[in-house]
Amino acid sequence: PNTITGDDNGSGYSDEHKTIEGFAFTQMSGVGWFGDLGNFLVMPTTGELYKVAGKENNDSIKGYRSAYNKATETAKAGYYSVELTDYHIKVESSATPHCGILHFTYPSSDQSRIQIDLARRVGGTSTSQYIKVVDDYTIQGWMKCTPDGGGWGNGEGKADYTVYYYAQFSKPLTNYGFWSADIPEHWVRKRDEVVSIPYLTRVSQAPVIKDKKELTGKHLGFFTEFPTKEGETVEMKVGISFVDMEGAANNFEQEIASKNFGQVKQEATELWNKELNRVRISGGTDDEKTIFYTAMYHTMIDPRIYTDVDGRYVGGDYKIHTADSTFTKRTIFSGWDVFRSQFPLQTIISPRLVSDELNSLITMADQSGREYYERWELLNSYSGCMLGNPALSVLADAYIKGIRTYDAEK
């Protein structure tokens, strides 16, 4: 769930907010510096179509964000659900390593909808997007995110990446459309600007386009409308890749195409249980055990898999490479934060993860031609965030403990 786009909220969600603006398929975890990702923002709605989320506690511009019932909010490893009270829609979500799934339960309505903000990005905006309607149930495309669109460090973090998607709906696309906002070239499109009233007004006035099957633009949105009966459910599955559209489609086919929401949720629970069972504890209260395993869960979110199911990944030279069986390319290494806490723990409970990350940093230094380890890596960016060279401590610790599945001489 996402509650905010601008400001300084790296995860895109804050418990203090009273409204939700959508559900994204990429997300950062527990960071500052204005955040990033939060791409492919999906929102189920009913009634009038709004093209912007609007602003919480600001009625000067209307949007599709919705209040939600805190009492219905459930969050577990691999599962989240909530009731959107403005639309009386229950939303449930789960995921596989490369894909996500949303399960919506609608009220009775002649104008139910799923809408997607393709430009959305935590801390800024995607600067260009592409979408194509593939068939009666499927869309695919990409979202290009550059420093000009803010994001990590409001652009100073130099995050430059493209998210590719392949999405299928359980209801046919019989009544769909796009919107495309004409953003002037001289407009700044960063953290504060993209949530300003002039910018939101510009997007809200974008015309609806219904006579096309594919579109490229600076600020695109997509929607599909359909009638629903009380309690009717609609599912949406999405494959994500940072390599190319073929990678997103292949990730989709390999991981989620043949599965329903219940299967994905069950497999996600089993996968997290397997990981969390790396450490077993005794004694303590139930609350203390919950705190322990919640903290442990957070240590396992990053560095995350950056390699497609076929082994391909975008390297430090921004070209496509293929990893061999010795490592899985990973991303999001917040060195300053983790070199003396998370990574010493991982050397004990998950040495393969440490090996993957060291190989990822080594290949990135080699492919980029920089020949040094980045201290805060995000999607191949040498962001320069924080101080020192914490990766050296991670490397030394791993080497001493016998984790040497990398080119030590290099």
Which stretches of residues belong to each language-model region?
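Accessory carbohydrate-recognition regions in carbohydrate-active enzymes
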Residues: 1-410
